[in-house]
């Protein structure tokens, strides 16, 4: 069972209690923590769309600490980030691996950050399937198509050429924050919030 801290605020109508994530959502901060799967992705997409409806001009901050997860779930978050009008800044704290690193790279150019001890990992998608030979062939084609799509997304957001992205994603490729900056996944390694304010 996961315990979620509650925050109590004084209002003109008395006290109001929020879970910590709802309170942070009021500040336009979205957390992506843990494995990326369908239910979590639906919640993140809903938060992005809600914040756009509330103020389409104001920046949204996405904090990422994730080992990755289901590709289609991650792509639903990615597509929504690109679809909505507000700029989405991304910040890695802890780790951004697999789909987590793709979402980190997908932030607004110039607004993609990582803390100094963050770990970023990119790799090609994996999949296992059992069944009839024809079904295995269908799924093999699908995973190759997904691999190609993910490569194209990394090319778009890192500025690297396709052969370089393909070579770097052939196996699990772990990076420190500085290396992720050199590769183009993030724009800046930050130690303090002031570093973000100075870069904007």
Swiss-Prot record:
Catalytic center residues: 98 (nucleophile), 123
InterPro entries: ClpP, ClpP/crotonase-like_dom_sf, ClpP/TepA, ClpP_His_AS, ClpP_Ser_AS
A family per Pfam: CLP_protease
SUPFAM superfamilies: ClpP/crotonase
Superkingdom, natural source: Bacteria
Biological processes, Gene Ontology terms: protein quality control for misfolded or incompletely synthesized proteins
An example Gene Ontology molecular-function term: ATPase binding
Cystine residue pairs: none
UniProt xrefs under CDD domains: S14_ClpP_2
Protein EC: 3.4.21.92
Keywords from the UniProt entry: Cytoplasm, Hydrolase, Protease, Serine protease
Reactions it catalyzes: Hydrolysis of proteins to small peptides in the presence of ATP and magnesium. alpha-casein is the usual test substrate. In the absence of ATP, only oligopeptides shorter than five residues are hydrolyzed (such as succinyl-Leu-Tyr-|-NHMec, and Leu-Tyr-Leu-|-Tyr-Trp, in which cleavage of the -Tyr-|-Leu- and -Tyr-|-Trp bonds also occurs)
Subcellular compartments: Cytoplasm
Gene Ontology CC: one annotated term: endopeptidase Clp complex
PROSITE patterns according to UniProt: CLP_PROTEASE_HIS, CLP_PROTEASE_SER
Chief location bin: cytoplasm
Transmembrane segments: none
Stated role: Cleaves peptides in various proteins in a process that requires ATP hydrolysis. Has a chymotrypsin-like activity. Plays a major role in the degradation of misfolded proteins.
Subunit relationships: Fourteen ClpP subunits assemble into 2 heptameric rings which stack back to back to give a disk-like structure with a central cavity, resembling the structure of eukaryotic proteasomes.
Family: Belongs to the peptidase S14 family.
PANTHER family: ATP-DEPENDENT CLP PROTEASE PROTEOLYTIC SUBUNIT
HAMAP family per record: ClpP
Protein name in UniProt: ATP-dependent Clp protease proteolytic subunit
Gene source species: Ehrlichia canis (strain Jake)
Name of the gene this protein is made from: clpP
């Amino acid at each position: 069972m996961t315990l979620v801290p509650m925050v109590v605020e004084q209002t003109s109508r008395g006290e109001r209690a929020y879970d910590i994530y709802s309170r942070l959502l009021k500040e336009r901060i979205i957390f992506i923590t843990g494995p990326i799967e369908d239910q979590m992705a639906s919640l993140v997409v809903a938060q992005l769309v809600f914040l756009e409806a509330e103020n389409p001009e104001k920046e949204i901050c996405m904090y990422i600490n994730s080992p990755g997860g289901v590709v289609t779930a991650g792509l639903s978050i990615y597509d929504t980030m690109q679809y909505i009008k507000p700029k989405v800044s991304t910040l890695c704290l802890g780790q951004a691996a697999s789909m987590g690193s793709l979402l980190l790279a997908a932030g607004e150019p110039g607004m993609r950050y990582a803390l100094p001890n963050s770990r970023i990992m990119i790799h090609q998608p994996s999949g296992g399937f059992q069944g009839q030979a024809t079904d295995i062939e269908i799924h093999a084609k699908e995973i190759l198509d997904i691999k190609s799509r993910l490569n194209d997304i990394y090319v778009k957001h890192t500025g690297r050429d396709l052969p370089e992205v393909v070579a770097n994603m052939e196996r699990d490729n772990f990076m420190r924050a500085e290396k992720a900056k050199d590769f183009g996944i993030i724009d800046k390694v930050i130690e303090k919030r002031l570093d973000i304010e100075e870069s904007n």
